[in-house]
Curated annotation (Swiss-Prot):
SUPFAM superfamilies: NTF2-like (SSF54427), Sec-C motif (SSF103642). It holds the Pfam family SEC-C. PANTHER family: ADENYLATE CYCLASE-ASSOCIATED CAP C-TERMINAL DOMAIN-CONTAINING PROTEIN, UPF0225 PROTEIN SCO1677. NCBIfam families: PRK01617.1, PRK02250.1. This is UPF0225 protein VC_1852. Belongs to the UPF0225 family. Gene3D superfamilies: 3.10.450.50. InterPro entries: NTF2-like_dom_sf, SEC_C_motif, UPF0225, YchJ-like_M.
């Protein structure tokens, strides 16, 4: 079985080692994938632990728990890039979730910082919302037109 993050490797070789040692991610994309898998597995503690300490994520435990307990469907990595320094990296992704039978897409360009040889999520930017046309392919990935699927 492929990993929850959509990688073709099995979970035991992809995100599980990072879930067992949150600071073992070698690049921001690994941490991003592990954070998504943690949402699928309802692992609130992992998500909190992998926020940058300056975010004080433990103070937002309820909001993070609510997000983690959403019905996440799949992750699509659009691009990755390193920042201005070797201690900064970005992952542009789309994460799909089901809310009451409707599929929604969260698109973000996440920023990660490396401190003491550990990667942390610090913040992200959301691209301007794009209006989906009725005849466009549905964002859920079904291959159907939006109007015949989630529209």
């Amino acid at each position: 079985m492929s990993c929850y993050c959509g990688n073709t490797q099995p979970y035991s070789q992809c995100c599980e080692p990072i879930h067992l040692n949150p600071h073992s991610a070698q690049v921001p994309e690994q941490l991003m994938r592990a954070r998504f898998s943690a949402h699928i597995l309802k692992n609130v503690e992992f998500v909190i632990e992998t926020y940058h300490p300056s975010c004080q994520a433990s103070n937002e435990r309820d909001a993070i728990s609510e997000s983690v307990h959403s019905h996440w469907l799949r992750l699509e990595i659009i691009s990755t890039q390193m920042g201005a320094t070797p201690n900064e990296g970005f992952v542009h992704f789309k994460a799909f979730l089901d809310q009451e039978g409707k599929v929604f897409c969260l698109e973000e360009r996440s920023r990660f910082l490396k401190e003491n040889n550990c990667w942390f999520y610090i913040d992200g930017e959301f691209p301007a919302a794009i209006k989906q046309g009725r005849n466009d392919p549905c964002a859920c990935g079904s291959g159907k037109k939006y109007k015949k699927c989630c529209g």
